[in-house]
Amino acid sequence: MLVIPAIDILDGKCVRLTKGNFDSKEVYYDNPADMAKMWQECGAKRIHVVDLDGARQGHLVNRKVIEKIVNSCSVDIEVGGGIRNKEALDYLFSIGVSYIILGSAAIYDKDLLLYSVSHYGEKTIVGIDSKKREVAVSGWLERTKIKDTELAEKIKEIGIKTIIFTDISKDGTLHGPNFEALKDMLKVGVEIIASGGISSIEDLKRLKDMGVTGAIIGKALYTGMIDLKAALLELEREGI
């Protein structure tokens, strides 16, 4: 199972939010590229990057910051937030991003989703952000009436192989992920990367036992609740 450190970018800095609330931001690092290098040195094989400004404004904002992250690391970089057109999508792959994450576009722009799948295949990931089992979009500021599993079934038919599932009510709380919702998502039959609330190695072990492909960790790393290097070593010893 992949353990994926998260870097959320707001105003060019590495921040964490709680439950997607922009007013709750905590700045952890001024230079996200240095943060990415540190996670790579700790043993991360992939890094999760979100342009929070982009998610809120509807277009990529932190392009230069993302470029610096990609140029600073040799591991896979996945990027989401504000990818709403072909130009942004093509640009990210052109600078060396390994995977892109479509969120709002998966609901509102089927053509873009189809374009990404046809041109980039399994490098296209869909992020499903759920609040009370309904999908939220636009940087979590807008809640739809679409059920999370319903969207998962639809995008599976289009050819999406991997979904990042985030329970917004858990994100940044350090209270553990929504295991019940993740069980339902796994029934769809695509690879699931869990995000939101992961706060311990025990959480990671349970996710692996469930069959989750990866786990994105944010606040637990930045607050020191999980030591990435130590966690990766322990999981490796246990064959996870």
Swiss-Prot record:
This enzyme's EC code(s): 5.3.1.16
GO terms of molecular function: 1-(5-phosphoribosyl)-5-[(5-phosphoribosylamino)methylideneamino]imidazole-4-carboxamide isomerase activity
Disulfide-bonded cysteines: none
Keyword Amino-acid biosynthesis assigned: yes
Keyword tags: Amino-acid biosynthesis, Cytoplasm, Histidine biosynthesis, Isomerase
Pathway the protein takes part in: Amino-acid biosynthesis; L-histidine biosynthesis; L-histidine from 5-phospho-alpha-D-ribose 1-diphosphate: step 4/9
Catalysis: reaction(s): 1-(5-phospho-beta-D-ribosyl)-5-[(5-phospho-beta-D-ribosylamino)methylideneamino]imidazole-4-carboxamide = 5-[(5-phospho-1-deoxy-D-ribulos-1-ylimino)methylamino]-1-(5-phospho-beta-D-ribosyl)imidazole-4-carboxamide
Claim: Amino-acid biosynthesis is one of the keywords in the record: yes
SUPFAM superfamilies: Ribulose-phoshate binding barrel (SSF51366)
Localization per record: Cytoplasm
Active-site positions on this chain: 8 (proton acceptor), 129 (proton donor)
Pfam families for the chain: His_biosynth (PF00977)
Any one annotated GO CC term: cytoplasm
UniProt cross-references to InterPro entries, sorted A to Z: Aldolase_TIM (IPR013785), His_biosynth (IPR006062), HisA_bact_arch (IPR006063), Isoase_HisA-like (IPR044524), Isoase_HisA-like_bact (IPR023016), RibuloseP-bd_barrel (IPR011060)
A GO biological-process term: L-histidine biosynthetic process
Family under the similarity heading: Belongs to the HisA/HisF family.
Name of this protein: 1-(5-phosphoribosyl)-5-[(5-phosphoribosylamino)methylideneamino] imidazole-4-carboxamide isomerase
Native organism: Caldanaerobacter subterraneus subsp. tengcongensis (strain DSM 15242 / JCM 11007 / NBRC 100824 / MB4) (Thermoanaerobacter tengcongensis)
